[in-house]
Amino acid sequence: HNPSITAERVEVCPNSIELYGKESEYNNGGLLQKLNIPTDKLLLIYGGNLGRPQGIDFLMDVLAANEKRTDTYFVVVGNGTEYGKISQWFRNNTPHNSCLIPSLPKQEYDDLVSACNVGLIFLDNRFTIPNYPSRLLSYLENRMPVLMATDMNTDIGPIAEKNGYGLWTESGNLETFMEMVEFVT
């Protein structure tokens, strides 16, 4: 993205963590039960900032499309400038296959991520600079596949596909995103 900088001056320094077996104070779906999240569906989680850069309108389109399914459930956890907008969407639509959780203590959030099956990353399709959301790390730490809908300038999706841990489409492409959901079920 910066052709004026020579390749010899650029170094990739990837984020990394050690993967260990994790212990949770919840077992047998206790946390899911506490949060009224079903245990008999594939659980897809979006956790983090709910702001304009995340393309919340497309996330809401995905949640609406998911209402036609009976085997998947979307868990949205977070806060941000667009929280009111998505909260209003939940009040107006009362979806059966998704929930909105405003925030959780870190350990409880980590336990929730580990109880889910698929991670989600959304970015607004109007981004013009690369963006690499850090929420990916908690998904990878839990060895979960990741579905991504981002702009064309962010390379997180192609990197995920190349390395076999996720699927990607451009944000706004609802048909392909729902095909990705079907693929992971």
Which residues make up each language-model segment?
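Short donor-sugar binding/catalytic loops of nucleotide-sugar-dependent glycosyltransferases
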Residues: 47-52, 66, 80, 104
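Charged active-site motifs of nucleotide-sugar-dependent glycosyltransferases
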Residues: 9, 37-44, 72-73
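Conserved donor-binding/catalytic core segment of Leloir-type glycosyltransferases
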Residues: 38-54, 60-63
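Nucleotide-activated donor-binding/catalytic signature segment of Leloir-type glycosyltransferases, i.e.
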Residues: 71-78, 83-110
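A short helix/loop element that forms part of the nucleotide-sugar donor recognition site in Leloir-type
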Residues: 22-37
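Carbohydrate-associated surface elements
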Residues: 13-16
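Nucleotide-sugar-dependent
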Residues: 54, 105-114, 119-140, 145-158
